[in-house]
A protein has these predicted regions:
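A generic structural motif
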Residues: 15, 27-29, 90-92
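Short acidic/glycine-enriched loop/turn segments that link adjacent beta-strands
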Residues: 17-20
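Conserved catalytic cores of phosphodiester-cleaving nucleases, focusing on short active-site segments
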Residues: 22-47, 64
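Mg2+/Mn2+-dependent nuclease catalytic core
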Residues: 44-70
Length: 114
């Protein structure tokens, strides 16, 4: 889905020790500075406990930011890239055996580094 929107895949499920995981690391070419896009993928079958976006708490955001810092240390070629944190959210994920594929909601700049 994201590649069809113009992003380029770089990595998925990138782990750093016990610090955390980055679901997707994508690249977005821009006119000025290229952008490294960190994408958190969330799924919820039902919204009775909140939406997928609601599940990305401030603590989860801090963990993603810290893991991104480790990623940048491991990949210095991205030092001069802009960084953006996006969320790809799937609501109402079908049960096994259902043919319906949910349409993702892509939230650019879902959160920022404070």
């Amino acid at each position: 889905y994201l590649e069809a929107q113009g992003l380029t895949f770089f990595a998925k499920n990138w782990h750093y020790k016990n610090l955390g995981e980055l679901d997707l690391v994508m690249l977005e070419p821009t006119q000025k500075t290229p952008c490294l896009v960190i994408v958190e993928v969330r799924q919820r079958k039902a919204s009775q406990f909140g939406t997928s976006l609601d599940s990305i708490t401030p603590a989860k955001q801090r963990k993603i930011v810290k893991t991104t810092a480790a990623f940048l240390q491991a990949h210095p070629q991205f030092d001069n890239f802009d960084i953006r944190f996006d969320v790809l959210s799937y609501e109402g994920v079908p049960s096994v055996g259902q043919a319906v594929t949910p349409t993702p909601t892509w939230i650019k700049d879902a959160f920022s580094v404070n």
